[in-house]
């Protein structure tokens, strides 16, 4: 019984992998694979951590 469950899961995995790769081949053949994506645009660098709030101090002249 355990062997049948293992064989069923293995067959299901193989069929899903095959279905995914055939879809990619189909989309590549009709020229729509990656459609809608523009050229590479670098992501602007952001600080690793949010900066603490820095209040603007008013400078008084004495």
UniProtKB/Swiss-Prot annotation:
Main localization of the protein? secreted
Report what the Swiss-Prot or TrEMBL entry states about this protein's PTMs.
Answer: Substrate for transglutaminase-2. Cyclized forms account for about 1% of total statherin in saliva. Sulfated on tyrosine residues.
Q: Where is this region: Hydroxyapatite-binding?
A: 20-25
Task: Give the span(s) annotated as Hydrophobic.
Answer: 38-62
Keyword tags: Biomineralization, Isopeptide bond, Phosphoprotein, Secreted, Signal, Sulfation
* Tissue distribution: Secreted by parotid and submandibular glands.
Task: Please verify whether the record's keywords include Phosphoprotein.
Answer: yes
- Which GO biological process categories is it annotated with? biomineral tissue development; defense response to bacterium; negative regulation of bone mineralization; ossification; saliva secretion
Instruction: Name one cellular component (GO) term.
Output: extracellular region
Residues bearing Phosphoserine are 21-22
Q: Where in the cell is it found?
A: Secreted
What's the domain of life for this entry?
Eukaryota
Keyword Signal listed? The answer is: yes
**Pfam family of this protein, just one?**
Statherin
Cross-link Isoglutamyl lysine isopeptide (Lys-Gln): located at?
25-56, 25-58
Describe the function of this protein.
Salivary protein that stabilizes saliva supersaturated with calcium salts by inhibiting the precipitation of calcium phosphate salts. It also modulates hydroxyapatite crystal formation on the tooth surface.
Please state which protein family the record places this protein in.
Belongs to the histatin/statherin family.
Protein's UniProt name? Statherin
In its UniProt entry, the species of origin is given as Homo sapiens (Human)
Q: Which gene encodes it?
A: STATH
């Amino acid at each position: 019984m355990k062997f049948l469950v293992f064989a069923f899961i293995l067959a299901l995995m193989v069929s899903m992998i095959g279905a995914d790769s055939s879809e990619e081949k189909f989309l590549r053949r009709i020229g729509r694979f990656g459609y809608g994506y523009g050229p590479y645009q670098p992501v602007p660098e952001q600080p690793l951590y949010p900066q603490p709030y820095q209040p603007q101090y008013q400078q008084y002249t004495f």
